[in-house]
Amino acid sequence: MVEPSRPLDALNNARDKRVIVELKNGRQYIGKLKSFDIHINVVLENAEEHVDGQLKRKIGTAFLRGDTITVISPE
């Protein structure tokens, strides 16, 4: 029998992989998921900020607050 997947398990499987994080304001951050906590605060490495699908700037390390995140998906 297969155990149901939990959201934090899915994030744990995405650790050290590139993800797309979309915020409530519509901005997207793409980078390697380094860490997260139970509040879904996330740290991305080699992060890039995208606005309206266009690269706005390269950030490096970014901390994104969980209550601003709407979607996290693999790249």
Residue ranges and their predicted role:
Residues 1-75:
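Conserved RNA-binding domains used in RNP assembly and mRNA/RNA metabolism
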